[in-house]
C-alpha cells in the first residue's frame, strides 16, 4: 500500500484520536520509504474491546501477541515482541501526524526493528538509515 492507501484505510476506521497509533512498518509508506502490505495499530484496551465487539477476529501469534485482525489491520494492545516495547502513550508523545492520523516516529520504528533483528528488519534498518541520511543532506 502507498501513503494515500494507508491514510485512506486508517481514516475509514474512524478511530478516536489518542486511542491508537499506526506502528510496525506503516510509517514507511507515509514517509515514502517503501510500500507496506498491512497496517499495524497499537491501541488502548478500551478501543481493543470496541473493535472486538465490532467483529474484529482475535488471532494467536504467540504468548504475548494476540491481535485483533480485520482487512489489512492488526490491532495490538502491547508491543512486547522484543527488548523494545513502548507503551501507546510513549509512542503518541513522539508521533508524526499526517492528515490527523498519528504514526509512530521513524526513531521508534528503528528502535523496534533493531531490537527485533529479523532479516526483513535488517533490510528496513538500511532503508531507515538511508532515508535519514538523505533528510540531513538534502
Where are these regions (language model features)?
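Compositionally biased terminal segments of proteins
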Residues: 1-138
Amino acid at each position: 500500500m502507498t501513503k494515500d492507501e494507508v491514510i485512506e484505510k486508517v481514516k475509514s476506521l474512524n478511530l478516536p484520536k489518542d486511542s491508537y497509533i499506526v506502528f510496525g512498518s506503516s510509517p514507511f509508506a507515509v514517509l515514502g520509504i517503501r510500500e507496506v502490505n498491512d497496517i499495524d495499530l497499537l491501541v488502548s484496551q478500551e478501543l481493543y474491546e470496541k473493535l472486538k465487539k465490532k467483529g474484529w477476529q482475535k488471532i494467536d501469534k504467540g504468548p504475548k501477541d494476540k491481535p485483533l485482525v480485520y482487512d489489512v489491520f492488526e490491532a495490538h494492545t502491547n508491543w512486547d515482541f522484543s527488548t523494545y516495547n513502548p507503551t501507546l502513550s510513549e509512542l503518541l508523545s513522539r508521533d508524526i501526524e499526517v492528515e490527523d492520523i498519528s504514526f509512530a516516529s521513524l526513531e521508534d520504528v528503528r528502535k523496534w526493528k533493531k531490537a527485533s533483528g529479523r532479516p526483513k528488519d535488517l533490510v528496513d534498518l538500511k532503508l531507515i538509515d538511508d532515508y535519514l541520511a538523505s533528510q540531513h543532506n538534502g
